[in-house]
């Protein structure tokens, strides 16, 4: 829909899908199968979501123009089943299986934190609940956790946002690009490892670790944090230089800053980690994901 001579544009889309015949590796008996592993199309998943777009041009004049565009996506998915019939044989898969885990220097022994669970979204955190600290024989702190695990969040965002703001004044223009993700969690494995005083002397510890004096690395929801963020992807400032030349038609110079800032409550390295790919790093911040770096660039465009 468009209003005000196309200066306000609204778009909305709803989608729902049911995916069947998903590939999965099954453990099977030999015989009747020639191998102990079988790749079969039996899994089912359901997805539905809503996409909303908004664009407005509040200023449109000869020497000045401002355009603001934003889109939001809200998505839900559910793993319905992995079981099914294959050539007369009913194949089953575990209802609960680990997807991602903590790994790397400073953490001794990998352990699953994010799981594939039938009846839930792909990539849920299934962890013991943190009950408090207790003092050990050395005067350090240990985690007290519940015996039972519970679903305490998901690694995939429930909502995603993208925005572009473009402003022009005579020969000058400024463009700002932003994106965000909301409704998901990040497991701060970096803090779990480096807030642990038992990491010394083999590894360094983080600032504040001696004061807290944690001497434990048991996994619980203590280091599970909100992954919500808004990231300013880049800001570009350009100048179309007025030029009178029989050889040069247009001359433009610009400068850009990429990864300007991230607005988030997350206390770890960065919330911008793997939140979509179903592999061992899903939803986990444990140094395997290289943080997005800031860069600066200068450009020149000449048209002859």
Regions found by a protein language model. Give the residues of each.
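Flexible, surface-exposed loop regions and adjacent strand-edge segments
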Residues: 26-35, 83-93, 191-201, 266-279
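Conserved small-residue
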Residues: 40-43, 50, 57-155, 258-268
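Membrane-embedded beta-barrel scaffold of Gram-negative outer-membrane proteins
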Residues: 1-33, 73
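Outer-membrane beta-barrel transmembrane strand signature
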Residues: 1-4, 9, 98-175, 213-227, ...
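Extracytoplasmic gating/loop element in the C-terminal half of outer-membrane beta-barrel translocons
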Residues: 179-260, 265, 272-274, 282
């Amino acid at each position: 829909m468009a209003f005000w001579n196309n200066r306000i544009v609204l778009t909305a889309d709803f989608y729902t899908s049911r995916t069947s015949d998903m590939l999965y590796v099954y453990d099977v008996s030999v015989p009747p199968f020639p191998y102990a592993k079988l790749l079969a199309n039996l899994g089912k998943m359901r997805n539905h979501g809503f996409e909303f777009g908004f664009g407005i041009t509040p200023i449109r004049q000869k020497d000045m123009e401002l355009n603001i565009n934003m889109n939001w996506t809200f998505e839900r998915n559910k793993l319905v089943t992995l079981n099914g019939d294959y050539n007369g044989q009913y194949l089953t898969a575990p209802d609960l299986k680990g997807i991602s885990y903590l790994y790397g220097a400073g953490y001794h022994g990998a352990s699953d934190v994010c799981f594939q669970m039938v009846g839930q979204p792909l990539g849920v955190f299934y962890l013991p609940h943190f009950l408090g600290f207790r003092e050990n024989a050395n005067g350090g702190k240990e985690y007290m956790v519940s015996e039972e695990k519970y679903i305490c969040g998901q690694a995939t965002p429930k909502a995603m946002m993208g925005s572009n703001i473009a402003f022009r004044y005579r020969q000058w223009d400024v463009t700002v690009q932003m994106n965000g993700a909301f409704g998901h969690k990040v497991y701060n494995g970096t803090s779990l490892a480096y807030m642990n005083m038992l990491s010394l002397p083999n590894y360094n510890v983080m600032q504040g670790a001696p004061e807290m004096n944690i001497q434990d690395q048991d996994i619980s929801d203590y280091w599970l944090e909100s992954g919500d963020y808004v990231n300013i992807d880049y800001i570009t400032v350009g100048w179309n230089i007025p030029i009178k030349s029989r050889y040069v038609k247009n001359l433009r110079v610009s400068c850009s800053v990429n990864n300007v800032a991230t607005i988030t409550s997350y206390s770890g390295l960065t919330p911008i980690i793997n939140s979509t790919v179903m592999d061992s790093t899903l939803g986990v911040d444990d140094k395997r994901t290289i943080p997005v770096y800031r860069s600066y660039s200068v450009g020149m465009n000449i048209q002859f």
